[in-house]
Amino acid sequence: MQEIELKFQIPPASRASLSESLRDAASATTRLRARYFDTGDRLLARSAFALRLRQEGEGWVQTLKGRGDGLMTRLEHNAPLGTDSGDAAPALSLERHAGTPAGAALLALLDSTGRTPADLVLQFSTDIIRTHAEVEADGAVVELALDVGQIAGGGQTLPVWEIEFELVRGAPTGLLSIAYLWTEAFGLWLDARSKAERGDRLARGVTQGDVPAVRPVDAAQPWSRQVAVALSPVLALVGDVADDLASPAQRVALAQALGVLAQTLRAEAQAAGAADTVAALAGMVFDAAIWCRVETQALWLSLLEWSLPADAR
């Protein structure tokens, strides 16, 4: 299964009003306690996988996530384990993901590096209160999930205040429409960093992520695919830049990635105006406030729509 979702950080000034709005949308609340696993040298994190055991209400679910085929998609498989273990976390078992694309991808990764499931050990944990509700727009049903809590690892904790928009059914453009409305109302800013990535950093005692490779796009590919490839390293970096955590190397990479993205956009008349805006942003990589503005988020959402294949719009 592939999930289609976007995640945003919530500025402190908007947290109370957003929480109230979500409660008004016939929401439910669940406590989610999770334990994340990886090899000692972070093989899963380095390969864009996340493997966790999470208590959801009275039961546990083992979840495996991996890289999908688009900017808003990820491989995912959930294996409910029932309520027999109570509050005690059950043992991890990759057999629960047997016969699924996500499970096959993880086993291939372990085999290719000479690892076994026994090499997967606990790295960090999360304790989250999730308030969630479903909303409709443009023929799509989208689940909104407000997550408030903390990540713990390496003897440290990190607060969490974020909201996810996940497509339940309908076209991805409906998800983008709903995300824009909430972004405009509450000043949200797009953040591609998952809890797994942030927890991995916390466990290692580092604040910045890796510097993604910035490569020219293949002009022979469909234009939507070119936009997706050019946008990927940009979205991988904007979370650290907006948090004012980015290293000099990350900022240089972001400026380079924005240059590639602007050049890609200029190939299409409909994106000419956006190309100029993207090029201007390349000169503002040291101004964290720029990356949190509603106008910047609207730009990312437009680019994400252009990155969708024609039959998905």
List each language-model region with its residue ranges:
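Function-determining surface determinants
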Residues: M1-R313
